[in-house]
Amino acid sequence: VERYICIHGHFYQPPRENPWLEAIEIQDSAYPYHDWNERITAECYGPNSSSRILDDQQCIVRIVNNYSKISFNFGPTLLSWLEDKSPAVYQAVLAADRLSQSHFSGHGSAIAQVYNHMIMPLANRRDKETQVVWGLRDFEHRFHRKPEGMWLAETAVDLETLDLLAQHGIKFTILATSQARSARRIGSTRWRDVSDGSIDPSMPYRITLPGGRTMTLFFYDGPISRAVAFEGLLNQGEYFASRLAQAFSDARDWPQLVHIATDGETYGHHHKRGEMALSYAIEHIESTGIAKITNYGEFLERHPPFREVRIKENTSWSCVHGVDRWRADCGCNSGMHAGWHQQWRAPLRDSLDWLRDQLASRYQKKGREFFRDSWRARNNYVRVILGRSQETIGAFLATECVRPLNDSERIEALKLLEMQRHAMLMFTSCGWFFDELSGIETVQVIQYAGRALQLSQQLFGDALESQFLDKLAQAKSNLNDRPDGRVVFEDFVRPAMVKLETVGAHYAISSLFENYPAESKVYCFDLNRTDYRLLSAGKMRLALGRAFVRSEIVFESEHVSFGVLHMGDHNVTGGVRQFQGDEAYAALCAEIGEVFERGDLPEVLRIVDRYFGDGSFSLRLLFRDEQRRILRLILNQALEEAEASYRQLFEHYAPMMRFMADLHIPPPRRFQIAAEFTLNSTLRRALEAETIDLDNVYALLDETRRTGIALDTQTLEFAMRGATESLAQKWFAQPDDVALLQSLSDAAGLAAAFPFPVDLSQAQNLFFKLLQDVYPSYSARAAQGEPDPKEWVSAFLNLGDRLRVRVG
């Protein structure tokens, strides 16, 4: 009997972009990374594209792309982020799908996913269809083929959703065994009840849908999947492979498929080095012949279903109550907050359902003015989302609109479609999954609702927001300081809202600290500066200017004027307003310039207040990343002064601290603080320098050991890793350069001197590529006695030892 193994990874992150900026702002909890997408890419998505297989001496013997040997899906919104922010990993995912087709009889391992992880049984049919269409189009755009399968968010399923998948050519999806109701052999008249989860997962099942269409369902092995995700099965790759092999049964007389499904982040993010356990397990299975590694498409072609199934509708893999986790206080939660309720889930769902319906009716009515078919236009809008260019948008509008649109009509049409996009993003499942209404995932979906409301207000001038907030107020929090959804909206959504004037204000403040070109970009906005004047008087600086601000998303633009005054430290004040004409602007510049020159600060502030009125702002208005950057610039001098004081204190008392350390006497806390600050900051700067002074860094490390000073592990590991990666990139671009090769080897040796592990994976990856592509030629020339290749090979072998990569 043939035996097959398929491992499926569901790779997904909740969207984290600010809906007004179309970008993720800095997330402190992800430190030392900018945000959680960046962190999880470093811990999981990247490592799975270049996973290590080690020998018995823990040296790397192979680097493999796990994605090419498993079945996987990536959330479209995550792939969009990877394409922009981590293109090497993104390309590795696409390459893995192409490679998998050579492994699996032409069947690619990637499958599609409903677009933004919406719980499909809780959506209306229109939204279900758009989710499927956008998921398919996104997949085809990226992988250049049609998907055979589609992942349903949380495997939440109903017959209408399956029928839509079948209608759009999807051959299969993956469910949990608990979602099957009954099964039988095709042709039999007797159904067997399997509602207790007892369906045999080792075969595919056909399901006949109400309209007569059919598709295939695979039910993954629950116990092994749970062991991988939660029970430490990834602690050793051999155990993982053994557990998979144990699932086969000699009692079965059909080709058996042992298959599991977990969150892809299990391999590396949730379980450190889980990607290596996965690589080892796959290699072990293949090398021992335990089974054939396959994917669902290949297995289905070879072994079509001979049994059929009926499902339990409105069920999922992560809620024992069906799909109540996304609409009710069912008891499913993270388990981290005993005593908390999730009664907020139902009113949040009701509020967003109400808003969806209100926006849909307005969209349909207004859309008739522009679109041949409003809902078809929404389905096809994914073409614009996948590539926002003048050409793409022009072609889309030419196809979908009843007539050519003028500029203002084009803006309205795009706002309608953006309103609908955010009306779907607000149903992303993560908004209900966790424990608290004011949690970041729930705030994110309410922000999408806020953006949809803002667009509706701009289009229709109606009062939907107040009605929505009345409904949202029924959602009660677990926290006294944010008791309900209305307060959450006012605290987290209202401050995040952006208008074109807000972008102008951001630009104005930033211009005091950065030299912008005449044409620049702030997130998804273009700025064209038409005038700019910077005046200085002592520590004070005054910037006056005007600029056109234009949204890249809806093409709306505004001509604004601004004035901003920096009085030193964090004291920044200014204003922005719609441009009032050349005469008014010239009068402002003349009046405020004269007053500023004579140092009359109170009068400058009065003029700013009089001219800009409600458009006044401060540093608080800056977008988060720029706010941090500017505050760091402002604080630099103070930090340098503080560091100099700490350094002076440390250097004066360092001999005493060493003497106390020799006697095993703990130093006074004040001295220890000075030493920790001085040594850690000096080390960080040394590692971030253009050229690392090796002797200095070794001396600093020796000092920390002698004085017992604790190192800032996260910051210094990140800096040491960055320095090594930078050198590796330079050497990879010039592999013949022996000096660069030696510098990288020195850096790798330095990394080993730190009292904590430094991630050298990027350097190892590049070394391994050159081991395959460049080393053979140098090795052959060195064997013939050529001196330069001999030197290169010697340095290369030394680097291999330090990177723990087996050569030869």
Positions of PLM-derived features:
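Extended, Lys/Arg-enriched charged tracts that mediate electrostatic binding to polyanionic substrates
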Residues: V64-N65, L82-S86, S178-A180, R184-I199, ...
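Extended alpha-helical scaffold segments
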Residues: F650-G808
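Active-site and substrate-binding clefts of carbohydrate-active enzymes
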Residues: E2-D55, R62, P76-T77, W191-F513, ...
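Mature N-terminal, pre-catalytic/accessory segment of carbohydrate-active enzymes
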Residues: V1-C6, Y646, F650
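Extended, well-ordered protein cores
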Residues: Q627-L631, E641-H652, R658
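Short, well-structured secondary-structure segments
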Residues: Y4-G9, Q13-R126, T130-Q131, H144-L152, ...
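Acidic, His- and aromatic-enriched active-site or binding-groove loops in soluble protein domains
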Residues: Q91-F104, G108-S109, V133, R145, ...
